[in-house]
């Protein structure tokens, strides 16, 4: 699949995820931890991608080794950013990181975050009581 098509699909997915989170009541004004996922069977290539992501201003966690269902091993890390659920920011980050993945020949596996809403605040209030 071409990079242009991958970007187009990722941008559409970004909008769907943001709309779903906000539609479910996640707080639009909160700052979110956005974790962009990378993976590769080649640790050296993955390490180069991590360095590139760091140079772009992302926090990068240590690579982890995981065993897949078929018994093969894969390495993965997250490039982390903190910002609002803003589609323009997500699109820009995804484009930058997908270019890194393409350059280093590793997989960009999308991004994830956590719901921020009333139940988190209620849990905090219960802990303080």
Swiss-Prot record:
Primary location class: cytoplasm
Q: List the subcellular locations.
A: Cytoplasm
* Cysteine pairings via disulfide bonds: none
- GO cellular component terms given for this protein: cytoplasm
Q: Which family does it belong to?
A: Belongs to the RraB family.
Q: Which HAMAP family match?
A: RraB (MF_01888)
User: What role is this protein assigned?
Assistant: Globally modulates RNA abundance by binding to RNase E (Rne) and regulating its endonucleolytic activity. Can modulate Rne action in a substrate-dependent manner by altering the composition of the degradosome.
Record's subunit section: Interacts with the C-terminal region of Rne.
This protein is called: Regulator of ribonuclease activity B
């Amino acid at each position: 699949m071409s990079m242009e098509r991958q970007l187009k699909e990722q941008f559409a997915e970004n909008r769907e995820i943001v709309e779903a989170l906000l539609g479910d009541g996640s707080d639009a004004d909160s700052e979110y931890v956005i974790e962009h996922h990378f993976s590769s069977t080649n640790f050296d290539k993955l390490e180069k991608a991590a360095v590139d992501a760091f140079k772009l201003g992302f926090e990068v966690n240590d690579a982890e080794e995981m065993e897949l269902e078929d018994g093969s091993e894969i390495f993965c890390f997250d490039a982390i950013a903190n910002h609002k659920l803003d589609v323009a920011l997500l699109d820009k980050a995804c484009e930058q990181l997908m270019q890194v993945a393409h350059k280093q020949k590793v997989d960009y596996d999308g991004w994830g975050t956590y719901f921020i809403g009333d139940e988190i605040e209620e849990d905090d209030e219960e802990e303080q009581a």
